[in-house]
């Protein structure tokens, strides 16, 4: 007996015998059940491997002598066949081919490449590009004249040259006015005239007509030089204070309210009982 091995004790040997007897008793019961209920022809002292082979055959598996196990009719490829590059698989092999890709080529397009037309039709874009380059800025409309908004600048297909610059209409330039008393800013430098401005209504003092203001376009207050009416917040021209005030400017001392101090009051008088303001004019 070699010196490197350890001798099991008596207790360990007894435990090993007990486990082996228990295993054999369980195996004997399994074999008896297979003989009675499964009609298996097993010998009295059979090997466990033989029992496993019989169970595999009953379940539809094939067990060879070397232990190779596979389903019946689906023998796997040999290892040597795989090394030699053989691709012939058994009929019931577990190898499944991937399904055909669900790729549907899109219809052929002239501008976008498709699987059937990977490069696209580049010649179809040439007429469109030629038509785009042939449109010179002179063919596009130019808006000018009596317009409140700024002139529309057409998009240029290429950089403008000296002969392509469009000169504004002289009528539009004549509408530009530079105020004398206004501040020197780009807002007051070039202002197009208001197309809705009525000079006759301005001379007659019609406060309901639209009036022009420097630096603005649209319906605004009139342009009046400063220094005319020192008592009011907004300078007014001569002869315009009485007409511009809602009511009569001469009655301002009697409680008449100017437009920049309160609401608009008509010529007729309203009784104090129907007044909707928070305060009363008598208590003021």
UniProtKB/Swiss-Prot annotation:
Record GO biological process: brassinosteroid mediated signaling pathway; DNA-templated transcription; regulation of DNA-templated transcription
Residues recorded as bearing Phosphothreonine in the entry: 153
Keywords: DNA-binding, Phosphoprotein, Transcription, Transcription regulation
Superkingdom of this protein's organism: Eukaryota
Region (Required for DNA-binding): 6-88
Biased composition (Polar residues): 85-97
PANTHER family in the record: BES1/BZR1 HOMOLOG PROTEIN 3-RELATED (PTHR31506), BES1_BZR1 HOMOLOG PROTEIN 3 (PTHR31506:SF2)
Family per record: Belongs to the BZR/LAT61 family.
Protein name (database record): BES1/BZR1 homolog protein 3
Natural source organism: Arabidopsis thaliana
